[in-house]
């Protein structure tokens, strides 16, 4: 039994009383009804497809009501993360982001790209930014092509972080040279999140 199957077997079910009797949901489906999305684990194409589908579904249900994404991710594939980022920016509802545990690499970029004033972190969460990683073997010309692609991705990611944090491109480029870990408070000071809180905020309850 692989790790994914084991995890699915541990997902609790919630029973809800409706006018037609009892209805059982897995916990994530029930929370999706409350416009809560969970981005947990490495970001790959499969994860991106799930998140994008949920964002589009919630927009179709109510384009005026906020969506909340809880992030606990070590990062992952840049193109998969960019698919989520572009969808967050594209849809009409404001997307609030909340860091629980960690938001590293692409996870940090998605955390920072939430709606202005609606980006949160819990007090013991960690945020890490860095430049994209890459490794390629092959002919020299192919290696050169991939190296230029990594540099282009790095420039684009730096632009996005600068846009959402208010930091200069030069500062972002310098600060992402190596793994740069930040506490929740430091992430707020840097502009990656807007607020750190230890208790649920009234405005977050109302927005969900």
From Swiss-Prot:
GO cellular component: cytoplasm; endopeptidase Clp complex
An example Gene Ontology biological process: protein quality control for misfolded or incompletely synthesized proteins
Cell compartments where the protein resides: Cytoplasm
Residues the record marks as active site: 105 (nucleophile), 130
Single annotated GO MF: ATPase binding
One Pfam family hit: CLP_protease
Gene3D superfamilies linked to this entry: 2-enoyl-CoA Hydratase, Chain A, domain 1
SUPFAM superfamilies: ClpP/crotonase
Record-linked InterPro entries: ClpP, ClpP/crotonase-like_dom_sf, ClpP/TepA, ClpP_His_AS, ClpP_Ser_AS
Coiled-coil regions, chain positions: none
Reaction catalyzed: Hydrolysis of proteins to small peptides in the presence of ATP and magnesium. alpha-casein is the usual test substrate. In the absence of ATP, only oligopeptides shorter than five residues are hydrolyzed (such as succinyl-Leu-Tyr-|-NHMec, and Leu-Tyr-Leu-|-Tyr-Trp, in which cleavage of the -Tyr-|-Leu- and -Tyr-|-Trp bonds also occurs)
Entry keyword annotation includes Disulfide bond: no
Keyword terms, alphabetized: Cytoplasm, Hydrolase, Protease, Serine protease
Predominant localisation class: cytoplasm
Record's subunit section: Fourteen ClpP subunits assemble into 2 heptameric rings which stack back to back to give a disk-like structure with a central cavity, resembling the structure of eukaryotic proteasomes.
Function: Cleaves peptides in various proteins in a process that requires ATP hydrolysis. Has a chymotrypsin-like activity. Plays a major role in the degradation of misfolded proteins.
PANTHER family (alphabetical): ATP-DEPENDENT CLP PROTEASE PROTEOLYTIC SUBUNIT
Protein's UniProt name: ATP-dependent Clp protease proteolytic subunit
Species: Xylella fastidiosa (strain Temecula1 / ATCC 700964)
């Amino acid at each position: 039994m692989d790790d994914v199957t084991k995890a699915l077997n541990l997902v609790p079910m919630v029973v809800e009383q409706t006018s037609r009797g009892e209805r059982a949901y897995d916990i994530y489906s029930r929370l999706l009804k409350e416009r809560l999305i969970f981005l947990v684990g490495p970001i790959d194409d499969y994860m991106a497809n799930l998140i994008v589908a949920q964002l589009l579904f919630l927009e179709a249900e109510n384009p005026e009501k906020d969506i909340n994404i809880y992030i606990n991710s070590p990062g992952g594939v840049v193109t998969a993360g960019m698919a989520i980022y572009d969808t967050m920016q594209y849809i009409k509802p404001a997307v609030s982001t909340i860091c629980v545990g960690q938001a590293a690499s692409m996870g940090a970029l998605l955390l920072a790209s939430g709606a202005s004033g609606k980006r949160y972190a819990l007090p013991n969460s960690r945020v890490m930014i860095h430049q994209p990683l890459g490794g390629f073997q092959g002919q020299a010309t192919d290696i050169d092509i991939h190296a230029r692609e990594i540099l282009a991705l790095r420039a684009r990611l730096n632009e996005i972080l600068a846009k959402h944090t208010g930091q200069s491109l030069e500062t972002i480029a310098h600060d992402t040279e190596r793994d740069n870990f930040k506490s929740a408070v430091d992430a707020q000071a840097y502009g990656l999140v807007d607020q750190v809180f230890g208790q649920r905020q009234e405005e977050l309850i109302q927005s969900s």
